Amino acid sequence: MNKFELTSAYKPTGDQPEAIAELTEGVLQGVPAQTLLGVTGSGKTFTIANVIANINKPTLILSHNKTLAAQLYSEFKSFFPNNAVEYYVSYYDYYQPEAYLPSSDTYIEKDLAINDEIDKLRLAATSSLLSGRKDVVVVSSVSCIYGMGNPSDFYNNVIEIQQGKAFSRNVFLRRLVDSLYVRNDIDLNRGNFRVKGDTVDIYLAYADNLLRIIFWGDDVDSIEEVDPISGVTIARFDAYKIYPANLFMTTKEATLRAIHEIEDDLHKQVQWFENEGRPFEAKRLQERVTYDMEMIRELGHCSGIENYSRYFDGRKAGSRPYCLLDFFPEDFLIVIDESHVSVPQIRAMYGGDRARKINLVEYGFRLPAAMDNRPLKFEEFAEMAKQVIYVSATPADYELIQSEGIVVEQVIRPTGLLDPIIEVRPSHNQIDDLMEEIQIRIEKNERTLVTTLTKRMAEELTEFLLNNNVKCNYIHSDVDTLERVKIMSDLREGIYDVLVGVNLLREGLDLPEVSLVA
């Protein structure tokens, strides 16, 4: 399928038809930047969905936090149920980056926990983009500007099979291993495959079902999609593309070349430290990099291998890393949601990363090449963003300047809702006052959002409300990404009456059942 099919029970009303027509015309005429200035509740997401359906281009929707990205993903999934709507955010449930604090001589080791489900969704996004189909929407956080593998290496490891075509089983198994699938005949998990005679079962890294390939001699006899629990055949295929199990692909030749280049740069950097009269840093760097190279030779990877990504990608010093934007075709659209927040966030990513890494390089923990494992600079992102629609109720000067006066306004709400009444109340007895307001909402079967200043305050207030028989939960950055989505869904369904959070509840969340924000 290569055409977007918009599915909705509603028709554009209010300011939406005019906004859709203007934005569509702008994109089709090649206008580089436009701004959709829409008040809260005016249906900006529905407008953008209509524009995407009209222009029929692969589209990146960029959001400033994971929670809002998850909500947008859910909305676009409902608008385009028959198209490829993907989700691409950071796959870390917990991430402590490597750092060095010279003032206290403290080295902080990198520590992380990867969410397997989000890793699957990220792989699904890149696989859809490289499949060549046009009807792809990827909803992403700022993760899309962070470094990842070379798309050419990823694409070169795609395995194409056809029913009835000659393909040696042993060659096929070797290709699977090259694509980073792991053989496991006992416990078949995502990214594994098992072999039983002429039957090969592959648990695709980016899907929920197994792919079963049955060989007859050196020919592919059948290709089936199988339910991993029941074993029932769901679908049969004449041809199939198997995408790699990891976003970071390389070859043995590239690995050997990278090791050689790393050792050359190590020698130069050690020499520099010694000439500067810093033998301790020289010794530290020599030991750390030598150990990493031994690990890569023996196991194919090491802790912190991303700091050597420039060598594996074959990039020059200072050049930008590959990122999700490289997986899109030349002609694609970027929609930046809540742009007044998202644009400054994109701008800040490079500086924050550089400030941390500069100490690691300066004190001999990493080679200078570690500086090239980074997010895009804002200028690099702007250069790659050939066509952008900024979406905001309060666009900043940057968006307005970039749009050169092309501002599409959407101020009439299709629902006829008025702006909410804002009251400022004294902090004296604020909890008692809050409890009274919550009870009023509960009696009307409505929901309440409560914002606090800190994560600890959110947790303590939630505990207090629960002790007072209020169905309540909290979300903040320590709550897993997918768990946040479930909690917000539970709020809408009435499992909770109150949701407590910090500033991530501030922009863009669409919760029609909520009638009070305190």
Regions found by a protein language model. Give the residues of each.
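ASCE RecA-like P-loop NTPase motor cores
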Residues: 1-518
